[in-house]
A protein has these predicted regions:
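Short acidic/glycine-rich loops and adjacent helix/strand connectors
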Residues: 1-355
Length: 355
């Protein structure tokens, strides 16, 4: 019997999962216990619940896996700040102390936190790290009913990747293609979330819900100025309009000038038809990109099944458009498509790919 504990934490949507011999036994999100929406803290309560539900002690666990690789994320941060210098100096000064104090030493930090669950837990070598998008892909493919599938993941950013394509076949999952930061469909959508006055990494569903009340009259402005979309759905974002790579905001003055208004202050300004039209426009662009990617993948790999995960896969309207296009015979979406599902995916990847 092999027991694996998967953990996601320290960005948003912390969670824990336990699988035993490849079977999902327990999975829980920390916010359900703390009542803090998108709780990013170490998932102590979720781990306690999972251990209790599985009727095991932490020391019984054979392997513990974190859903992403902190050193690669730190590499991205450093390379990004160097590439955009001198822009981003304030953001750099704010980020570095956190990384140098805690995040770079995540294995030791995890070990110290894990010991609080079980005084007998003393083996730091049980702790492993998965790739962020591999965790997403595994969370979508391995629980799916398919023996073989194309697996598309899209979110803000993992270590470097923002969009990946993998092929899953039985116990194997191989990433074939990647789009890298700063070019990100998830961050593009989050930029408009910010611009319309909603909270990033939280209010994207509100932007999606706002879209039906508007008309996509700004679609042309988006595709002509902000994003270059290729025939296969791959894309390139014009960083002249964004601050997210190095700044403390998602968009900048050039973005404001393009659409004729500053970002909405939700404490002072009500939503207007302008914001509804903006929402409709970015929603349509997102749907068209996802459909183009889906069509090109079906044509290239000719596999009838599609699995989806990553934060963008929480856009159920876009998922519905892919389904309506009848590109694939079958589509399976990981319900916990965001980072919470990464805890499950990391554990499943370690079990299946390690076999």
């Amino acid at each position: 019997m092999k027991i694996i504990l998967g953990i996601s934490a320290f960005y948003h949507d912390s969670a824990a999962s336990i699988i035993i011999d490849g079977k999902i036994i327990a999975a829980a999100q920390e916010e359900r216990f703390t009542r803090k929406k998108h709780d990013s803290s170490y998932p102590f309560n979720a781990i306690e619940f999972a251990l209790d539900y599985a009727n095991i002690k932490l020391n019984d666990v054979d392997q513990i896996i974190f859903f992403e690789k902190p050193f690669l994320k730190f590499e991205r941060l450093l390379e990004t700040y160097v590439a955009f210098a001198p822009k981003g100096f304030k953001s750099f000064c704010m980020a570095m102390p956190i990384w140098l104090k805690d995040k770079l030493f995540q294995k030791k930090m995890l070990f110290n936190e894990l010991k609080k669950h079980d005084n007998n837990f003393k083996d730091e070598q049980k702790i492993f790290f998965s790739d962020h998008h591999l965790s997403h892909a595994a969370s979508a493919f391995f629980p799916s009913p398919f023996e073989e599938a194309i697996v598309l993941t899209a979110d803000g950013v993992g270590e470097w990747a923002t969009t990946t394509v993998a092929i899953g076949k039985k116990n194997n999952l191989e990433i074939k293609k990647e789009i890298h930061f700063p070019h990100s469909l998830g961050l593009l959508y989050s930029a408009f979330t910010y611009y319309t006055g909603f909270k990033v990494n939280s209010g994207e569903y509100k932007l999606m819900g706002l879209a039906p009340y508007g008309k996509p009259i700004y679609e042309d402005k988006i595709v002509k100025n902000l994003i270059d979309i290729k025939k296969d759905g791959s894309f390139w974002l014009n960083q002249d309009y964004f601050n997210y790579a190095t700044g403390l905001t998602m968009t900048n003055d050039k973005f404001d000038n393009l659409f004729g208004q500053k970002a909405r202050d939700s404490k002072k300004e009500k939503l207007t038809q302008f914001h509804m039209d903006i929402a409709a426009s970015i929603q349509k662009v997102t749907e068209e990109i996802m459909i183009k990617i889906a069509k090109s993948l079906k044509e290239e790999f000719n596999i009838p099944n599609l699995c989806l995960a990553g934060g963008v896969a929480l856009n159920c309207v876009a998922n519905g458009k892919i389904l309506k296009e009848k590109i694939f015979d079958n589509i399976w979406v990981q319900p916990a498509a965001g980072d919470a599902g990464g805890s499950l995916g990391a554990a499943l990847a370690l079990w299946h790919i390690d076999q």
